[in-house]
Amino acid sequence: MGEYIGDYTRKAMELFNFSSFRFQRSIVKAMGMVKYAAAKVNSQLSLLPSDVAEAIMKASWELVEGKLDEWVVVDVIQTGSGTGLNMNINEVIAKRASELLGRVVHPNDHVNMGQSSNDVVPTAIRVATYLEVESSLIPALTDFTRLLEDKAVEYGDLVKPGRTHLRDALPVTLGQEFKAYAGMFLRDTEFLKSALERIRELPIGGTAVGTGLNTHPRFGELVVEELRRLTGLPFRRGNSFVGMRSLTDVYMVSSAMKAIALDLIRLCNDLRLMYSGPNTGLNEIDIPQEIPGSSIMPGKENPVIVEASMLAAVQVIGLDTAVSLAVNLGEFELSMGIPLTGYDIILEVQLLSGALRQLGEYVIARVKPNKERMRKLAESSTALITMISPLVGYDKASMLSKAVNIRDALRGLGISENEINRILNLKRLTEPGIITRELGK
């Protein structure tokens, strides 16, 4: 195999030398699929000689398989249509196809036949996003949610103090908290799957401005049909005028991932607080650590995976902001934020998938509740006075909470010790009911 850098790519490398950012494997793979499908369809429509089409398809599939990745070298920061990426791909495929065929295959006349960067790259980033979310993020999210649900059952009877505004509140179980976390991510999964539905429509076949000039009328429809076959995913032919000028459907996927990131930060904050200590914090849970937490304090253990997951989530939120701005670039017939949108959204998928996997494996699966500590904290909560509020009124209960603990308050109401012990069954306080109505029963 030889050198597959073409003249356009060399010039693009010189001009778009902004960063070290290069397109991810999933985007290169999707571009290869689009080129494979285009060559096959152009051959079926008798527009491209079968031997040329066969060579292009073989070279395109090598790109899909990752065999030509080293030659996809253009910077992500480039012209807003993604022409740099499209031409880099065209030239790599053309040079490899020429090698396979034994004569010249042209990057524009043959590989790019019936296509424009303006419809190819928006199509590829939708395909890449759908593939990456379906194969990576949804499985990671599903496994993570299931793990939280399992822990909710396991910790169903472990009572701990509830807290609102970081102040004492009525007791809850650790299981109830984990069930709530699971519910958050279940909701996020539904949002993500709904957003995926929006990127099923592909604009391929619109060529330069959406009209489809210089392509066969059936080209777009047949390419999408082939992409369905290659991916096993439910793509359909969309309105090219819409899909080329607007990427807000892609942004919906980014927005769904931002929601996951926000809930991930929320969960991680609670885990850090429960793990705080061991002697000067809450110390309600223990999280076995794999590496030392400090380079100067011997024996110090820190929630390193929890914090790393939070950093990943923060980065996702930042990327979502970038995507929201990128999809708004452009005028009239074409979006001008296509390559950056594609790169950022795939990075969001990768970061979230990794964070969910690592947090699940190294934290959620290994959490060890400090049962006695949680029980003592729950029993000492000033909010327990809430249970006698229906009996003595809010104002008196409020005064009692500042003066005595709940046990003394109940004694002051003339309630026997046996009855007090029955009332102060903390597990009962985590369930619906009016405890004072049961006094004397």
Regions found by a protein language model. Give the residues of each.
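Conserved, well-structured ligand/cofactor-binding cores
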Residues: 1-441
